[in-house]
Amino acid sequence: MNRSFATTAATLALAALATGAWAQKTELLVYTALETDQLKAYTESFQKTNPNIDLRFVRDSTGVITAKVLAEKANPQADVILGVSATSVAIFAAEGMLAPYSPVGFAALNPMYSDSKRPPYWVGQDVYAAVVCYNTVEGAKKGIPKPESWADLTKPVYKGQVTMPNPASSGTGFLDVSGWLQSMGEAGGWKFMDQLDANIAQYTHSGSKPCRQAGAGEFVVGISFDFRGNDVKQKGAPVELVFPKEGLGWDIEASAIMKNSKKMDAAKKLMDWVATKEANEAYSKNFAIVSHPDVKPSLPHIPADLEKRLVKNDFAWAATHRDAILAEWQKRYAAKTEK
């Protein structure tokens, strides 16, 4: 009787311990620039295989997240960086803030879209590229033609009808500016931006906002990025998406572990998920180019040859010169930024 009672008590105690261990959750603080309409699906996908890890997001535009991470360098708060531009994440790596880690399944990914070091300091998820959203109804009403090139947007007919993101606050804005400087040369890039600025009505803090503005008819043209352009058109706005013939600036949504994280095991689990085929299938619902070569996105309003339209992009150059580029841009054009 006593032995049976003792055995039962021990069994119950072990069960209670096991239940407690199972129920105990780890919370990761994740800094992200992902769109809010992407985070829910990504979180659900991750937690299917990691139910004991909760993700608490601090979400803002790329420029704000970049400034926040750098400001916290002496006392980092985040455990993981998720979906922030590779140009910014490369800066964090150069500042010694990241932990190198090769996720399970990393070898299957396209090496072109992740850090070249082994083990990598950051892992790419997908490519996002410049797009011009043109409102066909407002364009016809105002006699403003659909542009076909970046050069077209400097013509007088577009004066006061173009919006684009401020590169200091928006990763989309920075990929535009970096792409122009790299493809046109620095002198040519600044000359182009001087001419474009004459037609700009407003610089926004969001990469999505210019396309939404064009979709709503607030302005005829919005310089944005492919995900938001496809989304706005898919929802029925009267927009045509233009992929300027000179080539498209682009960046990579990248993820990394902060070196000082005290939850390294959970952080590695999140990075393992980032590299999975399942995660890439989730990205492919939003982007036309993802890191896993076996995942073939097909978005209705994005050209199948998008990859061929991308300009050459030196991420190391962009990361090294980012501060100087932004300082010069702010000096020349910031007066038109929305309040």
Residue ranges of each PLM-predicted region?
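Early extracytoplasmic/lumenal segment of secretory-pathway proteins
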Residues: 24-90
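Extracytoplasmic ligand-binding site segments that recognize negatively charged/polar headgroups
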Residues: 33-40, 63, 77-218
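A ligand-binding cleft/hinge motif common to bilobed small-molecule-binding domains
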Residues: 87-91, 215, 219-238
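Short beta-strand->loop
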Residues: 99-107, 122-123, 151, 237-249, ...
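Periplasmic-binding protein-like
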Residues: 111, 157-165, 192-197, 203-204, 235-259, 274-297, ...
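A bilobed periplasmic-binding-protein/Venus flytrap-type ligand-binding module shared by bacterial periplasmic
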Residues: 133-138, 178-181, 251-263, 282-283
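Extracellular/periplasmic bilobal clamshell ligand-binding domains
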Residues: 300-339
